[in-house]
Amino acid sequence: LEKGLYRTESGKVLQFSAEEMNPASLSLKIACNDPYWTKISQIKAKWYIKFVLNGGNPVTGTPNKNWWGIRPVHCREAVALFLNIGYMCTLEKFQQRVSTFQGTFLDNNRYPVDTSTLISRLENLSGFDIGLIYSGNGVSGLGGGRTWGVYQKSFLYHYENSGGCCSTIFHELGHCLGYNHNSTMTYGQWASGCADVFYKNNIKDFPVNSHTILKSRSNPNIY
């Protein structure tokens, strides 16, 4: 950065010396009144997201066991999906919805999950290694730790929860939260009745609220 005239946040134009423009003394702030930016700026989650092939070949389309090679079309939908989930976690009405399941959500030992901390636990996960599931083996999702993957339909049709694809999404997030199939956080009302239903019913209010934005369903690079 060089000495020069700069417009401040208040609108004034001031001259700053090169010393005053030292990058170490500056911070970045983005200001925008666009509704999309307003929504995503409210997201508290700091998930570090990677896209992984897990041995699948995205060029030839050859799967490796239960994994297809994820392609850019799926990565874009994953960004949309996790922006929506991150924003959903900030909504008071989602917390209220989750709280109604106190005593219904059970952990791996069949003890009640504290619903008052569930959303913050999800927000505080470190992130996800996102892959694409090959459904030819009868598998629609895999999750646990940082690993999170769903079949193609969940990436393309999460906007309407078509065929219960959102249940798969939140089932695998239940695994990422540390729950196994002995809990009700995978097979149970967390993924089938609470989070999936709320996502579908409130999609119009989310940052990426329609499949027509990315138009992935007509993308020639889907499987």
Set out the residue ranges of the language-model regions.
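Walker B catalytic acidic pair
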Residues: 172
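Predominantly extracellular/secreted Zn2+-dependent metalloproteases
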Residues: 1-166, 176-223
